[in-house]
Amino acid sequence: MANSSNLKKPNFVGVDLGGTNIKVGVLDDAGKTLSYVTTPTLVERGPEDATKRMAEAVLQGIEKAGLTPADVARVGLGSPGTLDIPTGSLVRPSNLPGWNFFPIRDKLAEYSGLPVTFAHDGPAAAFAEYWVGAGQGEEGLILLTLGTGVGCGIVLNGHVWNGTHSHGGEAGHNLIDTSENARWCKCGQRGHLEAYASATGVANRTIEYVEAEFKTSLTERVRARKRDDEIPKMVFEEAEAGDEVALRIVKETARYLSHGMISLIHTIDPSCILIGGAMTFGGKTTATGRIFLETIEQETRSRIFLHLAERLRIDYAVMGNDAGYVGAAGLARQDWEEAQIAE
């Protein structure tokens, strides 16, 4: 492997492994992206093939940045699914079928010739916000990402919190509904936050409003849909146009999310919670996005201890689709720095 101990201005590579694509970014020590490369995951070919192509993308990104492997101190790899971080293995990644118990960290190190830091994609995204994003300087940061599911990453005192069994931050499976008719989560349990505050939850509730014949401009669009995952965008567009049912769904989603946040706040006492992911209804740039955040704030602050409500910052994340690879590179940088101190 490359010897990084003598690098004056080290560079780092971040890899974001997804079910569809692998994103690779080469970053300098300040967190600036020098080059960016993507390659399809091609899950069906298996983890060995994907890891070899991942390593090729890492080396391609290094060359594209005008560097050599000797200029890179370390690679960071962020992965979805159930992981065993100490051993660097995928355990049961739900969106990577057939990849169970694959030692991906060591394989990437072998194929790239560079040392590798391994992390869950949620904490990696949170670390990106802490390092160069909206969470800079925060002592306790929680990032909640809203998409098909609800992801989470926690950064405490500058370090990601992975938990004892590499499961820390699975806030999407916090219980928010104990009723007999609680919604099913895709994990097979009822009443989890993810079943209510994710894009899937929004789609399911919207369908119910349409089937109950509420008066809404969503009706024709929802009935004509090709896929359920088109519905959250419809809700956003109709909410922007002032549709009352669409706005109701947005506010419901905000309240459900806040209910999941409350237990996190009282347990962890963060200084900041950031909301990111694909389903933020346009963020601060749109009226609906502002209503969404305002509703989250109002519901949350009204239900937590007053001294926390007065101090907690709730805001949108800013790193977007770059968060995964940037955070992975940042974690690689942190590991490298700590190794230098130890020497």
Predicted segments, located by residue:
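ATP-binding/phosphotransfer module of carbohydrate and carboxylate kinases, centering on a glycine-rich
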Residues: 1-74, 84-89, 106-114, 128-138, ...
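Short hydrophobic alpha-helix segments
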Residues: 37-39, 94, 164
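A charged helix-plus-loop insertion that forms the helical arch/lid used to bind
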Residues: 88-99
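A short acidic/small-residue loop/turn micro-motif
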Residues: 40-42, 98-99, 167-170, 176
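General beta-strand structural signal in soluble alpha/beta enzymes
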Residues: 116-120
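Short beta-strand scaffold segments in enzyme catalytic cores
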Residues: 22-26, 150-155
